[in-house]
C-alpha cells in the first residue's frame, strides 16, 4: 500500500529473517517506480539494495490491502499464503 505524508507518497517494506519480520522501513513511491503493488515491489527491493541494506525485503500494506496484515516486528511471513501473520496472543495465567 502506498500512502501520502505531506504530499509524498510512501511504501513500506519489511525485512524478513528466518520467516520473521525484524525491521520495517518506508520508501518513497518515486523509488518504487511510481506504481502500485505488485509492480512496485521489485523496483523498491532494488532501491533498498542500492542503499546497502541486505536481506529479503517484502512490501507490506499499511492498510492491509495485500498480504493480509501490515507487517510489524515479530510478525511471521507465511510464504505459502503470501501473508504476514501476527504473533499469537498469550493470555496471562491466573494463579490461585
Short names for language-model regions:
Residues 1-96:
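Viral virion structural and adsorption modules
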Amino acid at each position: 500500500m502506498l500512502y501520502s505524508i505531506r504530499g509524498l507518497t510512501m511504501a513500506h517494506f519489511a525485512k524478513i529473517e528466518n520467516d520473521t519480520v525484524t525491521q520495517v522501513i518506508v520508501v518513497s513511491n518515486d523509488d518504487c517506480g511510481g506504481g502500485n503493488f505488485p509492480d512496485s515491489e521489485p523496483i523498491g527491493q532494488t532501491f533498498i539494495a542500492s542503499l546497502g541494506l541486505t536481506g529479503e525485503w517484502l512490501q507490506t500494506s499499511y492498510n492491509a490491502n495485500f498480504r493480509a496484515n501490515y507487517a510489524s516486528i515479530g510478525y511471521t511471513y507465511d510464504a505459502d499464503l503470501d501473508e504476514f501473520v501476527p504473533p499469537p496472543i498469550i493470555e496471562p495465567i491466573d494463579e490461585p
